[in-house]
Amino acid sequence: MAETPELEPHNAFDTILTLDFGSQYTHLITRRLRELNVYSEMLPCTQKLADLKFKPAGVILSGGPYSVYEEGAPHVDPAYFDLGVPILGICYGLQEIAYRLDSTNVIAGTSREYGLAQLKAKKVGGHVDHLFDGLEDEFNVWMSHGDKLGKLPEGFHTIATTPNSEYAGIAHETKPIYGLQLHPEVTHTQNGTKLLKNFAVNICGCKQNWTMARFVDQEIARIRKLVGPTGQVLGAVSGGVDSTVAAKLMKEAIGDRFHAVLVDTGFMRLNECEQVKQTLAEHLGINLIVADASQVFMEGLKGISDPEQKRKFIGNKFIDVFEEEAKKIEDAAAHSETAGKIGFFLQGTLYPDVIESISFKGPSATIKTHHNVGGLPKRMTEGQGLKLIEPLRELFKDEVRDLGRQLGIAHEMVMRHPFPGPGIAIRILGEITPERVEMARKADHIFISMIREAGLYDKIGQAFAALDPSRAVGVMGDKRVYENIVLLRAVETTDFMTAIAYPFEHEFLTRVSTRIVNEVSGVCRVAYDYTSKPPGTIELE
């Protein structure tokens, strides 16, 4: 994407850079800022300023699970403090600001402070008060820390206190450097969004112009410049909202020079191929090619149970198929008006995919290789062969849905649940066989159909049925059986970074379970996954 950096979001919009020290809340900082129509990006705390390709309007140092004084604790590049832009430290970030001035400034608290606390703001005068402009003098905030400031850093004022934190808020006397022990990004903090707005808009001077209407124009211009007047793009589509929106955006940018490819891996949902054809080709006017590679994928995954090995194989084989299709398209169009080399490969990668795949030393190590990020072969990520183009890479899921509406995609399509590129293959825990694929496919169809019939589909962020690797004893037809277990998963979420299990009524789950056991051969037991994210991920592999 570096070919046209001047059109990337952080160069087209005022940007707040959030440096992540491993807090479970860090992504919420970016979310809250974007809800304020201020563009924000999150990078690991190891990001060196010299390697940053843009100048942010402000920098936020996130919370984290470390103690700043421990050996091996992460520390920010000191060069950020010489950048000349406002800085806000949150929790660990506050302690990092204080620690770099004097290592004795941060101490272990005599009592930990988790949950709600009453914060009292202190007026000092001048720019120091800007963080709390327009807010009440006292309000409840969310705390999550064991360490605290033992003394006020030299050159700083105290701007807020709580019963357990004498220095719950600090501000530099002359520089726009602020620190908060509380978490303004968490919804439990009253005025949290206002605090972030005061920092981003009033202190950093960011314009509140980050909208999908603006993004569409910027991204179409970027795509056109990147691809050029004759270049062609091949795109992976799966039937999910991400790939559909990405495909429509590419169609708007370069017209018939975009070719969508649906790889039938044999792991699609019931009737998925026909539905994708109808959506993309008939409703959205997109060139669609269906490549049947089901036998190749099934044979290649035989005997593989490890989820990372599955993802790596699927990622590599996907690109093999796409490169074959690219050659066919180029040959067919060699002497036509659309002649041109296919040099790019479109993916519907989202920002949560990127965040989950970022690794740095510490607790925010890679959760899993994402099939849209780490599952690709090196020849793709290192610029060999087809080059990656990911227009949704900086967006959260709700922003993608908004973008889809901006592009004129119908409500039903925009609200479709995500469907991973590897399909049912990563919803079958353990080894994949044709029989197990069919079980998972039928169970999923029953589950989703009943969710739709109950009028719950749009209330749920994502839902699916998966197959457990173990089996269980049951009694069917007066006989003992030892058969498979289906796992049902449905979550409520807005950004797919955090999620909670959807609270179905007991009667509904009973009816779903009864249908699956009666209608799906080889299944004798059904379980519902109540795990939230974190600690779980939404997909099981």
Curated annotation (Swiss-Prot):
Binding-site list for XMP: R311, D478, K533, E539
Biological source species: Aspergillus oryzae (strain ATCC 42149 / RIB 40) (Yellow koji mold)
Domain Glutamine amidotransferase type-1 stretches: 15-209
Domain of life: Eukaryota
Protein's pathway: Purine metabolism; GMP biosynthesis; GMP from XMP (L-Gln route): step 1/1
Function: Catalyzes the conversion of xanthine monophosphate (XMP) to GMP in the presence of glutamine and ATP through an adenyl-XMP intermediate.
Subunit structure: Homodimer.
Subcellular location(s) of the protein: Cytoplasm, Cytosol
Gene Ontology cellular component annotations, sorted alphabetically: cytosol
Annotated GO MF terms: ATP binding; GMP synthase (glutamine-hydrolyzing) activity; GMP synthase activity
Root EC class: ligase
The entry's keywords: ATP-binding, Cytoplasm, Glutamine amidotransferase, GMP biosynthesis, Ligase, Magnesium, Nucleotide-binding, Purine biosynthesis
Pfam families linked: GATase, GMP_synt_C, NAD_synthase
Cofactor(s) in the UniProt record: Mg(2+)
Domain GMPS ATP-PPase: start-end pairs: 210-416
HAMAP family assigned to the protein according to its UniProt record, in alphabetical order: GMP_synthase
Designated name of the protein: GMP synthase [glutamine-hydrolyzing]
Binding site for ATP: S238, G239, G240, V241, D242, S243, T244
Catalytic activity: XMP + L-glutamine + ATP + H2O = GMP + L-glutamate + AMP + diphosphate + 2 H(+)
SUPFAM superfamilies: Adenine nucleotide alpha hydrolases-like, Class I glutamine amidotransferase-like, GMP synthetase C-terminal dimerisation domain
GO biological process, one term: GMP biosynthetic process
InterPro entries recorded: Class_I_gatase-like, GATASE, GMP_synth_C, GMP_synth_GATase, GMP_synthase, GMPS_ATP_PPase_dom, NAD/GMP_synthase, Rossmann-like_a/b/a_fold
Keyword ATP-binding: yes
